[in-house]
Amino acid sequence: MNMTQARLLVAAVVGLVAILLYASIHKIEEGHLAVYYRGGALLTSPSGPGYHIMLPFITTFRSVQTTLQTDEVKNVPCGTSGGVMIYIDRIEVVNMLAPYAVFDIVRNYTADYDKTLIFNKIHHELNQFCSAHTLQEVYIELFDQIDENLKQALQKDLNTMAPGLTIQAVRVTKPKIPEAIRRNFELMEAEKTKLLIAAQKQKVVEKEAETERKRAVIEAEKIAQVAKIRFQQKVMEKETEKRISEIEDAAFLAREKAKADAEYYAAHKYATSNKHKLTPEYLELKKYQAIASNSKIYFGSNIPSMFVDSSCALKYSDGRTGREDSLPPEEAREPSGESPIQNKENAG
């Protein structure tokens, strides 16, 4: 063997080793697990992220995602209870496979488990839902419930068939319906919109009328309250005037009563003082003072009884009687029957 052949052999060996290494070394991304098949049999030990070595051409691997992933089911036919065929353009299923369940699910449903457990189940559940409802219900009335119904149905079956596979959310696009039916629905929606607008306008008008009525009621109540307040104010003014008049009358009556009491008290005191002051001796003194201050002289038979006390008058009367007895009868009485003193007084 010459040098050229030796070099070719070495190059062939190196190339074969390189090919074998390239075929045996593989990389697993983060969030994935690698399951291995050797001779078609699934090995029991999956590998995590990183570089791994396997027997080339004997062992193969499949990468299985264990983080959130979205599976899309497109153009799903669906027949309603009325016989109308509709198509749902896209259904998105957000799911996640737990790492501990990778081996069992891959063994039972292969590495393409989503086609068996999700895609087929979506078709089945959606057709059941459509066949039980009319086009009106599927397209309008119950469309918002399709997502939740599909999610619950999928998760219920997966809990039994594939524990560890969780459905996070289901999103369904609006169904495609025949063009003629779609136009009818659009016209119906337009009419419904007009009806809603008319109803809203009517509600607005009713609300405005109600607001106007409440405003009128409030205004009337305000006027009534103002009138009531003014009336109460006038009543209070009249009551105040009446009270003031009563107070003034009471004050005047009290003053008059006090004045009358004072006058009565003064008169009573004056009478009491006079009672104590006007004794017989004092009256006698005042009488003599009055006689002494009087410059007129009175003559007559009644003078002694007027200005002389009774004792003096009796003495004077007794003396005069004795003198008359000693006089002759002619001298004792004049022809006229009057005394000489009276005649002199009359003459004078």
Curated annotation (Swiss-Prot):
Keywords associated with the record: Acetylation, Cholesterol metabolism, Endoplasmic reticulum, Glycoprotein, Lipid metabolism, Lipid-binding, Membrane, Signal-anchor, Steroid metabolism, Sterol metabolism, Transmembrane, Transmembrane helix
Residues exposed to the Lumenal side: 29-348
Record keyword Ligase present: no
Gene this chain is encoded by: Erlin1
Gene source species: Mus musculus
Keyword Secreted on entry: no
Residue ranges crossing the lipid bilayer per the database entry: 8-28
Record-given protein name: Erlin-1
PANTHER family: ERLIN (ER LIPID RAFT ASSOCIATED PROTEIN) HOMOLOG (PTHR15351), ERLIN-1 (PTHR15351:SF2)
Broad class of the protein's primary localization: endoplasmic reticulum
